[in-house]
Amino acid sequence: MYRILVGLVACLCGASAMSQTQAPRVGWNLTAMTEGQWNMTNGKTSWVNYLEAGVEVGLWKGAAFEGMAIATWQAGGAVDDDNLGLSNIYADENKPFRLMQASLRQSFGERFFVSAGLRNVDADYFTTPATGLFTGAADADYPILSLNYPLATFPLGAIGIHLEYLPIDGLTLKASVYNGVASDDFNRQFRFCPSSDGVFSIGCVSYEIPTKGEQAASYTLGYVHGKTPSSDDGSVLERETGFWGLLEQPLAMFGKSQLILLGQGAAMTRCDVACKGYWGGGLVMNRIARNDMTAGIVCNHMHFAEGDETDIECTIHCHLTSWLSVQPALHVMHHHKHNFVAGLLRVSLELGNNR
């Protein structure tokens, strides 16, 4: 596997010798979020902050360097001990710098792309328009990933290879292989050690159909497979396989607004894992009123070894300007131990020429 990784990187570098040099182009983006959380049942509060900086630098023909780093800071801790997660920007540990991506991307024509380097699963697979509206962590990456594997989901990164192929218009094939253990420690991120860390692979087939509205109809089926260290004995590598799917189906138009059905689910082939399965369903309406607000409701349910959890989220995203937005959200959580209601208020600032 190590030889394959080195070989693909060498192929990317070799492509420069056969391509004409182009003037570098630099794209950048900066995202800052601050979020207040309030557990209305027990009165606990928390303040969460997130900063993300990304850059894309054009190199030779068809090639670019992609980089992204984040900083996280929170005060008050988690407002409850649920596994689904109320916030997709919350991290337990405060860190001023986490490198999430540092990779080389090479396109071969308009239909085949290869990226090699430090990467993140969330950015590669889970950034669709409908799921991206919601604040819950389960909509940012599926619980069967973050709870069953020590892989590169927020806020971690891992060395890997990511492939994308578009054989026909609307159809996208993706496949990735990552180091089996991800990290946010700079000294451990740039390692590919299948013998000790194992490997993790994920892939999917997606098909999009254009519609009259802003968002296309999208259908995705994917798999996950990992041979990663056991949670009981880190020296033992265990094989775990699962499957996941995502549906984003526009239902109707109301003026310029579009009503979209969201459906997602995942299941593991083994039952003796932390998270055996997950499903979610909801509705999203975009381009509401003059400032193009987006509103949605979603219900997420997780089958966890210690007990099932269900989270119902209602949220609305309001643009105040082209770069400033506010988003309140309400979560009603049915926990295997207790129930609670929590509110979030998120303010976001987005700048850059590559948004």
Model-derived regions: residue spans:
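Outer-membrane beta-barrel "beta-signal"
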Residues: 339-355
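Outer membrane beta-barrel
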Residues: 52, 56-180, 273-282, 286-288, ...
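Residues on the lipid-exposed face of transmembrane beta-strands in outer-membrane beta-barrel proteins
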Residues: 53-57, 102-106, 161-165, 203-209, ...
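Repeated loop/turn-to-beta-strand initiation elements of outer-membrane beta-barrel proteins
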Residues: 26-28, 62-65, 111-114, 169-175, ...
